Amino acid sequence: MYYKYDITYSNDVANEKEYLINLIDSPGHVDFSSEVTAALRVTDGALVVVDTVEGVSVQTETVLRQAMQEKIRPVLMVNKIDRSILELKLDGEAMYQSFLRVIDMANVVIATYVSEDMGEIQVDPSVGNVAFGSGKDQWAFTLAKFSRLYSTKFGIAIDKMMAKLWGDNYYDAAGKKWRTDGEAEDGKPLRRAFAQFIMDPICKLCQAIIDGNVEQYTKMLKILGLELSQ
């Protein structure tokens, strides 16, 4: 797979902008653990895909354990969020809590089996090693994508913006302040930044596509620098 790094919204100064990536699809079932081990021994990293509705399964734990044994650093893909939006019809806060449970469960497994010489390898959206998306519909994002969009608006560096978009961070528009207590200066409850600035636009985009509102979804896709395939 050829990948060219999108520097449109980035201030990164890394030397490499183009990559050739070889992906090995290994079985996740516990009965094929030897095949997973063989794949891990010829790779530089592991992309662990977890169903956000089903959560971390026995198979997921087995794969993470094997990655730790082979000293392979994992990254996490929280998959099937289309089900959360269209099937379960969860709001942004409920989806955040669902994603958080998956990430926390994965980190418990990692912490259980990691060796000290591997250093800090916990998966955390705010550092860029967790993606969210829909394999079925062929789209995904990391917090970095939205951080690049919002960093200019809020006058915050991209890495700091990523931290604002995860965890207990809320924006008080009236007071023009970021808060961590979920309550505005006037005592009114605030919406979590991840729900407000990421999931709300995604849910609105999905609904606009379903409703056939071409004008609305075309405008939203343009802001994201995306095109909708036929």
Describe the predicted segments one by one:
Residues 1-230:
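Structural and coupling elements of P-loop NTPases
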